[in-house]
Amino acid sequence: MGCVQSFRTLCDRPKNTNVRISLPAVCFVWQIAMIILFGVFIRYDEESDTHWIEHRKKENISSDIENDFYFRYPSFQDVHVMIFVGFGFLMTFLKRYSFGAVGFNFLIAAFGLQWALLMQGWFHSLDYTDGKIKIGVESLINADFCVAGCLIAYGAVLGKVSPVQLMVLTLFGITLFAVEEYIILSLIHARDAGGSMVIHTFGGYYGLSISWMLYRPNLDQSSNLQGSVYHSDVFAMIGTLFLWMFWPSFNSAITDHGDGQHRAAINTYLALASTVLTTVAISSLFQKHGKLDMVHIQNSTLAGGVAVGTAAEFMLMPYGSLIVGFCCGIISTLGYIYLTPFMEKHLKIQDTCGIHNLHAMPGVIGGIVGAITAAAASESVYGKEGLINTFDFEGAFKNMVPTKQGGHQAAGLCVAICFGIGGGIIVGCILRLPIWGDPADDNCFNDEPYWELPEDEESAPPILHYNNHMANKDVVDTNFGMEQN
């Protein structure tokens, strides 16, 4: 008990947001480390190396157009836009934290993708003949996926941490992601094309666990900056639209060429469309006078894309995709209305962006849908070759049957949750140390501590908020059941 009390006392020391030494030191040292590690380990793969001509002749490839670049790069472009524009602008809803939302998103994504190429390369792309990691366009897509988990986690602690803390969060998050991805995809042999388990479930619970460890009992001192204003919600909606439009590319980017990739895009497209309607319906039903809440429209409309990710390449059927989107729109929106305030009040989890409702819960639903769909697969639906190709029943897993594959899918979901929660608690303990330059409770959700602001912004008084992503609004009875004031 004495050690615990000493640790708490240490962590409760006065805050100092001056990162003039720590932030440049971390950026310079870690970037130099990346240069050295890339020099030692990273090389072009056979499709991006100058020996491609020889490889093409050896494999009897007739044209350069068959290079993987031309198959994957359109999807890579879409995923890249989602990472840097979609996630970045989605988090600009806070009235005084737009620089931090977009700028720090940019920072940790740029660092994270470099570290991800190394970590994922050591697990998946290491050539044991020369000890080098061979990278191509698919490696870039996987690195962006890896970064997405950390950006999801950032949403839980948005406005409450320093850029140095975010770099540490990303360093450990990428490392944990690479390990859990290897366990789920390679050892357990679960399929997760759109990352419902590997990306969203892990990233969601990783961020929530960190937020729980960094709980601020006096965060209400920054409540005047915790909401949005009209123009900040419009900017956040831009992020939503970019994510919504490109999510079919996200879920299909690394699936097998041909029918699997085609099917993944269709399933995601339909799930997203269905989610929009149910989100609007629930938002109107549970708000006073039937008005829509922009929080729900910005976030819950994307939940279907998250939940359909694992089963995106399976024979989910178009109506099945619509059902997944329908259910997720309801669950995610109700999560914002009831679950987020409950978690803050009773579980001490301050979830700034509501990632539990957009990523964690839909990710778990996606894992469950994937397990059920895999277990229900049959030769009559998939065909013999289709079943083998879709679930990769080859090599050590050639005797696998669909029902057993369903169990492996469920096991993969459990691993993602355990890594997210366990890793988040450990990293949260590290981030609680008073050496990272995080803001005081009365200075959160504010760009001023870390950014040079225009003079008119520095002197501007706080704007009264009209929309708060974390507010516990009063609930009153209506003819439909419950309604919010």
Swiss-Prot record:
**KW Ribosomal protein (keyword) present:** no
Q: Which residues lie on this side of the membrane: Extracellular?
A: 42-73, 120-138, 189-193, 255-265, 321, 379-410
Q: Which organism is it from?
A: Takifugu rubripes
The record lists glycosylation at: 60
Q: Which Pfam families match?
A: Ammonium_transp (PF00909)
GO biological process entries: ammonium homeostasis
Q: Which UniProt keywords apply?
A: Ammonia transport, Cell membrane, Glycoprotein, Membrane, Transmembrane, Transmembrane helix, Transport
Q: Name one GO cellular component term.
A: apical plasma membrane
What does the record give as the function of this protein? Functions as an ammonia transporter. May play a role in the elimination of ammonia in the gill.
Q: Which residues lie on this side of the membrane: Cytoplasmic?
A: 1-20, 95-98, 160-167, 215-233, 287-299, 343-357, 432-485
The superkingdom of the source organism is Eukaryota
Q: Where in the cell is it found?
A: Apical cell membrane
Q: Which GO terms describe its molecular function?
A: ammonium channel activity
Report the family membership. Belongs to the ammonium transporter (TC 2.A.49) family. Rh subfamily.
Q: Which gene encodes it?
A: rhcg1
Q: Which InterPro entries match?
A: Ammonium/urea_transptr, NH4_transpt_AmtB-like_dom, RhesusRHD
Q: How does it sit in the membrane?
A: Multi-pass membrane protein
What tissues is it present in?
Specifically expressed in the gill by mitochondria-rich cells.
| Coiled-coil intervals, chain numbering | none
Name of the featured protein: Ammonium transporter Rh type C 1
Segments traversing the membrane: 21-41, 74-94, 99-119, 139-159, 168-188, 194-214, 234-254, 266-286, 300-320, 322-342, 358-378, 411-431
**Which coarse location class applies to the principal site listed for this UniProt protein?**
membrane
| SUBUNIT field | Homotrimer.
